[in-house]
Amino acid sequence: MYFMADDEQIRRYEFKRALEELSKLHGRGTELISLYIPPEKQISDVVAYLRDEYSTSSNIKSKSTRKNVLAAIESIMSRLKYYRFPPPNGLVFFVGHIATRGDQTEMYTKIIEPPEPITTFMYKCDSEFHTEMLKAMLDEKEIYGLIVIDRKEATVGFLNGTRIEVVENVQSQVPSKHHQGGQSSRRFERLIEIAANEFFKKVGEIANNAFIPRIKEIRAIFLGGPGATKEYFFEKDYLRNEVKDKIKDLFDVGYTDESGLRELVEKASESIKDMKISREKDLMDRFLREVKKPDGGLAVYGEKAIRDALEQKMVDLLLISEGIRRVKYTYKCPTCGEEKTFSEEPSEWPVCDKDGTPLELIGEDDMIEDLYKLAKESGAQVEIISDQSDEGKLLKQAFGGLAAVLRFIRKDNVQNVM
């Protein structure tokens, strides 16, 4: 994950974690309901559909399965009463009796407003929850600008994640280079260049109007086309400086319509990959430069050291591996009120130090979200690093998935403890 606003990063992290938890849940039978509701779907139509399913499910032979499926459908219908319309991106319900210890089950309900619009209505009753549509939304959604151009045609578009969006395709009125109607060669060439200049100005205007409003979120712009036209278009003043500065590479492509945009994306794929790797490398290099200093420099790693530094508002940059999952477990004595926290689930149930009373579990908090909150409060920059690159693997394996660069060195220093 790269170049996302901090809030977007943590929302993506929370979303991914929720899907991982859902994937671990199973039912005793086919009694877990996954319901996807697109934003344009009428709630009344969904309720009518569920009533039909309720009627059908009344014929399930297994008494326990029938009871659990009917209870899940009733639960969904009761919750739908609170919605006049689906939210802007739709709504997803995961409801059913999940298997717990032994032969026990318990009712589970998870309602998700997805980060992107649901496109298909889906109802499934199975032994597991279906999260495939939501998992597809985890694909990186970096935005790139695209231009393909020659003297006869040009197309401007965006690459949004894996989806190519065409902004506009424009045909030129530039005549072919041959004599017509007895005109002199010099005069005809002049007319051709005037027409070409007007065409390039029009393409530049389309590109500027498309890219300028989104210039901060555009990672890079790629320019392609057959022959030397793309170089000429790039070198002249058809594009505003803000747009030109974002152009990363020029590529030879055979077409200048929508298929040309697809070809441009294929040609630029290595460049996109290199930019992502370069971004992670720069972040990790900054941290490693500090680690290599004799006194450890401004580097800290490990949950305890980083938490201490965040609480003292010392952290400038916080690096979090996308692959780590940590939960803080909080227990409380029902007698004296003593609390204990654990960074891992205890192998044995904890008891009170004072009287040996078994403690009650009162909270399971995601440690990453907790650190993120501290970082936001202190004004630290937060970057969640993929665990697919060499740098991301190093962060996860060598430093426990958590690393930070401080704003200043504290006199008594922060001890790095994994």
Curated annotation (Swiss-Prot):
GO terms for molecular function: translation release factor activity, codon specific. Transmembrane segments: none annotated. GO terms for cellular component: cytoplasm. SUPFAM superfamilies: L30e-like (SSF55315), N-terminal domain of eukaryotic peptide chain release factor subunit 1, ERF1 (SSF55481), Translational machinery components (SSF53137). Its main location: cytoplasm. The keyword Metal-binding does not apply. Keywords: Cytoplasm, Protein biosynthesis. It is found in: Cytoplasm. Directs the termination of nascent peptide synthesis (translation) in response to the termination codons UAA, UAG and UGA. Heterodimer of two subunits, one of which binds GTP. Belongs to the eukaryotic release factor 1 family. HAMAP family: Rel_fact_arch_1. This is Peptide chain release factor subunit 1.
